[in-house]
């Protein structure tokens, strides 16, 4: 799976079917390692209850569970959800999995200490993320920017961040870390924005 294609998953029922088909093929780049940005910042996160949005096969959710979190993971693909369940069993941890369309799903308010959003952009979710975090909770957010079009297949620009958009979207939070630019991973360049921010009120 090309993680960048996650941005198209809310295009309609045919997209959901395509994602189920993709997740059925393990050769489609199944990522089983947690995101580097998450691993690097795990010590900065408050303990408690965590939510992983668009979790895919659950690698980040499982990493949090292994580090003592009570974790909820949501994805639109039933196949991804089933794989996440299987991987949690392999790892000997437990996460609550939910199949849902995040463009319409209602998040409970003041419920989570940590919320993850990796390589998925649904702008309407940002206000929901803010409400779903407890005071003192932290959002961990990383996804592609417009500049990424230089390095990968054509993207729908609606699913790419504008310059400083992610930072400005959380201007009412205490920003612990923010970085935007081009990085290299596995010999490939990608343009991303990475944010760690705390809800202070």
Residue ranges and their predicted role:
Residues 2-45, 48-56:
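Conserved class I S-adenosyl-L-methionine
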Residues 70-75:
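Conserved SAM-binding motif I beta-strand of class I
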Residues 77-79:
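Conserved SAM/SAH-binding beta-strand->alpha-helix loop
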Residues 91-102:
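Conserved SAM-binding strand-loop segment of SAM-dependent methyltransferases
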Residues 107-114:
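A short acidic, Gly/Pro-enriched loop at the edge of an enzyme's catalytic core
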Residues 137-144, 148:
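Conserved beta-strand signature within the Rossmann-like core of class I S-adenosyl-L-methionine
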Residues 184-201:
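Core SAM-dependent methyltransferase catalytic element
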